[in-house]
Amino acid sequence: MPLIRDIHQRFWRLPQLPWLELRTTSESRQAYKRHSPPQLSLGAIIAGETRCISNGQEYLLRPGELILIPPQSPHSCNPLHERPRSYHMLYLDADWCLTQLPHLPADSRLHTTQPQLQNPQLFQLYQQIVTSITQQQTAGLPALIIHLLRALPLQSADAEPPCAISRQLVARLVSNLQKPPTLDTLAQEFALRKETLIRTFKQDTGLTPVSFTNMARIEYARHRLRAGDDIADVAYQTGFADQSHFHKTFVSYTAATPRQYAQNRSISDNK
């Protein structure tokens, strides 16, 4: 399998449109750990096949198909039989999306019952958006994205909000990403067994406390890398023992190296 540093991929961010990010990846066999980005994610399969698991359901994605992942929805999208696949992934800020969906309450949690989309018209519109972003043609781009967004099968989630324990646990976990509390410490603080904490939290979030913490650290790292912080500083800010540990964890959740993400371009000499 090619090294992650040799995979041709690029991240596109436009300063005048801070609510969007585009990723383009070619011929990658790199797998992802289960993750739950805070943005609305819309992927397009260009070549190869991808196996996506979301909300306990498995979807086989082929070229010409889209995959719609609501914000904070745990999922994994990985190559089938370790064969290479090429794809785009468009990330849209969740709050911005809600402002463009007036039929939904402003405090909605976005949800879909149809994540796999086999719609040639939507796929063509998606490709038009990708072309506009990669050529930095911003005039008319917001209107195209809003048109696409409003055509997606999105609803407001009817699910019950997380229980008090999970809400408190989230607040505790993100309060100090540089030195997150151990499960033993949390069990003592909440006067609960570790197994009970893990089970309750996973029922509400789809992730274990450890996975949630790693996701929060990587999301904060992405934010600091976009801001231009040095990779070694970001590794320290997010509480990793060393840069190697940070690199390995970042790759496992994003299928990209910190340097690829920070430099916003595809390079073949990432370390």
Identify the role of each PLM range.
Residues 156-165, 207-213:
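Short, Lys/Arg-enriched anionic-surface-contact patches
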Residues 9-107:
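N-terminal regulatory/effector-sensing and dimerization cores
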Residues 101-160, 171:
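Amphipathic alpha-helical segments enriched in hydrophobic/aromatic residues interleaved with Lys/Arg
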Residues 171, 184, 202-247, 263-271:
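Terminal helix-turn-helix DNA-binding modules in bacterial transcription factors
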Residues 189, 193-194, 241-242:
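Short coil turns linking two alpha-helices in DNA-binding domains
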Residues 64, 197, 201, 245-246, ...:
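Short hydrophobic/aromatic patch on the recognition helix
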Residues 176-180, 208-209, 229, 257-258:
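Short helix/strand-capping hinge loops at secondary-structure junctions
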Residues 121-132, 165-176, 220, 224-227:
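Solvent-exposed, amphipathic alpha-helical segments
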